[in-house]
């Protein structure tokens, strides 16, 4: 085992990387409220795991979406628990994100030189809300259907580009299969990928600049 470790250590300097990760200075003013961002990340990871598990059974069609969710809840082993954890962690993620934003704002964590960290955080907040909007529609029940119809109809008030934008969101003039397919694709692929990218940028900047000092 020692020889294997030495082989990797010689090429990758694993010990130096480990020392850098474990020996980062933590300011004395840091308290439990500085953990809100980490809790938000944890909720996101739970979302990814439980969401991935449900993709094995969920069917993104207007005729089968609702019945597939019912199947997950009633027939799949621990399916009810997986979906419930997914919903609970979604609510927790939004709550922790809001509290994290307040903490950063109140402690001045958005000020120079951390402006870009704040910008990526705002983008992550928008992505988090987008998760909620797209995920809410996936069961394709009455609530989900009408929520999608209302949300996708909002841009229609924008002059000139309103109607084309609505059609782009819905995939057609009216809400239907194309809309569900778009929302499913956004919820399970596009948004998670963008979130992972911006989270990585967010954490790398925090790692580089350190935690902001007290007011």
Swiss-Prot record:
Cofactor note (record): Binds 2 heme b groups non-covalently with two histidine residues as axial ligands. Binds one heme group covalently by a single cysteine link with no axial amino acid ligand. This heme was named heme ci.
Disulphide bridges: none
CDD domains: Cytochrome_b_N
Gene3D superfamilies attached to this UniProt entry: Cytochrome Bc1 Complex, Chain C
Named cofactor requirement(s): heme b; heme c
Keyword field contains Plastid: yes
Subcellular location: Plastid, Chloroplast thylakoid membrane
Predominant location category: plastid
Name of the gene: petB
Membrane topology: Multi-pass membrane protein
Residues given in the record as heme c binding sites: 35
Xref: InterPro entries: Cyt_b/b6_N, Cyt_B6_PetB, Cytb/b6-like_sf, Cytochrome_b_N_euk/bac, Di-haem_cyt_TM
Residues the record lists as binding heme b 1: 100, 202
Lineage of origin: Eukaryota, Viridiplantae, Streptophyta, Embryophyta, Marchantiophyta
A single GO molecular function term of this UniProt record: oxidoreductase activity
Protein species of origin: Marchantia polymorpha
One GO CC annotation: chloroplast thylakoid membrane
Any further remark recorded for this protein: Heme 1 (or BH or b566) is high-potential and absorbs at about 566 nm, and heme 2 (or BL or b562) is low-potential and absorbs at about 562 nm.
Domain of life from the UniProt record: Eukaryota
Name listed for the protein in its UniProt record: Cytochrome b6
Transmembrane segments: 32-52, 90-110, 116-136, 186-206
A GO BP annotation: photosynthesis
Chain sites annotated for binding heme b 2: 86, 187
UniProt-listed NCBIfam families: PRK03735.1
């Amino acid at each position: 085992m020692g020889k294997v470790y030495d082989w990797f250590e010689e090429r990758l300097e694993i010990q130096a990387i480990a020392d850098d990760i474990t020996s980062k200075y933590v300011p004395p003013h840091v308290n439990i409220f500085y953990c809100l961002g980490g809790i938000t990340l944890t909720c996101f990871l739970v979302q990814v795991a439980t969401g991935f598990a449900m993709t094995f059974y969920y069917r993104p069609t207007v005729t089968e979406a609702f019945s597939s969710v019912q199947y997950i809840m009633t027939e799949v082993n621990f399916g009810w628990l997986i979906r419930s954890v997914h919903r609970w962690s979604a609510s927790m993620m939004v709550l922790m994100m809001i509290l994290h934003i307040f903490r950063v704002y109140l402690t001045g964590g958005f000020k120079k030189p951390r402006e870009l960290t704040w910008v990526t955080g705002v983008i992550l907040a928008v992505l988090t809300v987008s998760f909620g909007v797209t995920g809410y529609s996936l069961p394709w029940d009455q609530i989900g259907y009408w929520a999608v119809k209302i949300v996708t109809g909002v841009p229609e008030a924008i002059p000139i580009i309103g109607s084309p934008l609505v059609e782009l969101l819905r995939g057609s003039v009216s809400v239907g299969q194309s809309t569900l397919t778009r929302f499913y694709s956004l919820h399970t692929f596009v948004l998670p990928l963008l979130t992972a990218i911006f989270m990585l940028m967010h954490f790398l900047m925090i790692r580089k600049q350190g935690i902001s000092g007290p007011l």
